């Protein structure tokens, strides 16, 4: 199917919009293809031309979010650690509702693993192996440790109260923590 075809683009956008709306209104496990297609005003057959099932649709929505995050990471690579971390957390703040909901669905662990892999790959681009090996540490274990810490901090950030002052401090604390590991 030609992804550049305007009809395809509009249909996918309609399905995605319907899905996101339902995703915020209902528990993911209770969303049906019928509801998505009715809300998107497309037939079930049309839905299945674009997606295998609702899990495939969610996977593609998550992939789009990670692509956005990758673009932010690329844009921030010339910034200092604190400024770059601030941009990163702004992305998650702007998508807070989505990620809070995503991390609380029944198969959330697979999406956390996907995000973990993304974070590991970003660190591998920026952290030379000597940072770990000079300390007698295994590089992959080092990257995995830091990346899992980021997932934990991100989870805390997303689930923290609406205390704006505390939320504003998190990127600063993250950049300071990363500097402890020679990642500044």
Where are these regions (language model features)?
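Secondary-structure edge/capping motif, primarily at the C-terminal ends of alpha-helices
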Residues: 73-76, 99-102, 130, 157-161
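C-terminal peripheral helix-coil segments that are non-catalytic and often amphipathic
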Residues: 148, 159-184
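Amphipathic alpha-helical packing segments from all-alpha helical-bundle domains
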Residues: 108-133, 137-151
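Cytosolic nucleotide-binding catalytic cores of signal-transduction proteins
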Residues: 23-26, 134-138, 155, 159-161
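Primarily secretory-pathway and cell-envelope proteins
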Residues: 1, 44, 77-81, 88-90, ...
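Amphipathic alpha-helical segments used for helix-helix packing
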Residues: 87-116, 155
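An amphipathic alpha-helix adjacent to DNA-recognition modules
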Residues: 9-20, 24, 29-33, 38-41, ...
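N-terminal intrinsically disordered/low-complexity leader segments
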Residues: 1-8, 184
């Amino acid at each position: 199917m030609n992804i550049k075809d305007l009809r395809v683009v509009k249909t996918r956008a309609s399905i995605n919009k319907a899905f996101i709306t339902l995703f915020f209104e209902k528990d993911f496990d209770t969303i049906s293809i019928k509801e998505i297609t009715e809300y998107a005003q497309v037939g079930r057959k049309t839905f299945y031309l674009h997606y295998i099932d609702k899990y495939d649709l969610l996977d593609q929505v998550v992939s789009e979010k990670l692509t956005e995050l990758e673009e932010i990471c690329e844009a921030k690579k010339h910034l200092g650690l604190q400024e770059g971390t601030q941009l990163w957390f702004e992305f998650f703040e702007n998508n807070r509702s989505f990620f809070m909901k995503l991390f609380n669905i029944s198969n959330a662990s697979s999406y956390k693993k996907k995000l973990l892999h993304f974070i590991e790959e970003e660190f591998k681009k920026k952290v030379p192996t000597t940072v770990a090996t000079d300390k007698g540490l295994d590089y992959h274990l080092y990257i995995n440790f830091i990346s899992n810490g980021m997932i934990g901090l991100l989870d805390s950030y997303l689930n923290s109260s609406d205390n704006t002052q505390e939320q504003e401090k998190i990127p600063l604390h993250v950049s300071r923590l990363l500097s402890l590991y020679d990642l500044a």
